[in-house]
């Protein structure tokens, strides 16, 4: 579904991405981990066609970027990010915000099709959010808004869902509720690509992990192969132990490491 071959992005003398090659298949769900500035978000922007490489080849859903209409490819990609959330209108009712996802609008300026309204309500009910459907988006907590973004991203029934730190800024309770909704995506035929700083956010949904440092991959493969002491130390520059509990990895920093 997603193939990057020897992708580099150069700005001045800086390699933001440096010879990145990775293959993501339809039956796989990927988490991308790394420190701030490691190139994670830039990698997502390559996948969505909002940035193009200085060198290399990007292929998504069988389409090679630079040889296709990227706007058409994006219709099959759901996207969640804080920057997108900030562009939405806080006074709009929740169901309407969700419904805009069917058309890639930020808000409606005309009558909303009944079909879109019904699907928006259905997705909100699926997430036990139906009681908030008529509330203005601005009255919701940060965690609730993130769930609205998730419902919105599913409106167009995408083949790929790309999430850029969807749990950033959430307290422990709201983070775990959001992660539960993300893990429930196992029930859908959709490939998920998820960027985070935090290893413990890798819920059982995710089958594969890519580790990034300074614009390069330090590891990529199944989560069992990649999440090990040596690669974590190499990626995060810290000595830590990794433990698995409840199908999720948890990290413990070694004192003095």
Give the ranges of each region predicted by the language model.
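Conserved ABC transporter NBD signature motif
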Residues: 56-66, 73
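Catalytic Walker B motif of ABC-type/P-loop ATPase nucleotide-binding domains
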Residues: 161-164
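ABC ATPase nucleotide-binding domains
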Residues: 234-257
């Amino acid at each position: 579904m997603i193939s990057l071959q020897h992708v580099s992005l150069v700005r001045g003398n800086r390699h933001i991405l440096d010879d990145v090659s990775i293959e993501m298949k339809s039956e796989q769900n990927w988490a991308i981990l790394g420190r701030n500035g490691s190139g994670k978000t830039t990698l997502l922007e390559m996948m969505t066609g909002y940035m193009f490489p200085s060198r290399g080849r990007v292929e998504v859903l069988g389409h090679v970027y630079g040889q296709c209409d990227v706007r058409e490819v994006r219709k099959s990609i759901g996207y969640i990010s804080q920057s997108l959330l900030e562009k939405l209108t806080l006074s709009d009712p929740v169901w309407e915000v969700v419904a805009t996802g069917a058309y890639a609008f930020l808000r409606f300026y005309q009558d909303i099709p009944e079909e879109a309204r019904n699907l928006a309500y259905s997705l909100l009910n699926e997430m036990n959010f139906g009681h908030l459907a008529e509330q203005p988006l601005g009255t919701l907590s940060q965690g609730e808004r993130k769930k609205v973004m998730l419902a919105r991203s599913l409106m167009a029934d995408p083949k790929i869902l790309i999430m850029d730190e969807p749990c950033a800024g959430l307290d422990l309770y709201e983070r775990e509720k959001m992660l539960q909704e993300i893990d429930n995506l196992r029930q859908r035929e959709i490939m998920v690509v998820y960027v985070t700083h935090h290893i413990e956010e890798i819920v059982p949904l995710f089958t594969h992990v890519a580790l990034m440092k300074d614009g390069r991959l330090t590891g990529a493969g199944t989560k069992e192969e990649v999440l090990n002491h040596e690669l974590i130390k190499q990626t995060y520059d810290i000595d830590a132990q990794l433990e698995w509990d409840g199908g999720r990895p948890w990290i413990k920093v070694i004192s003095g490491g």
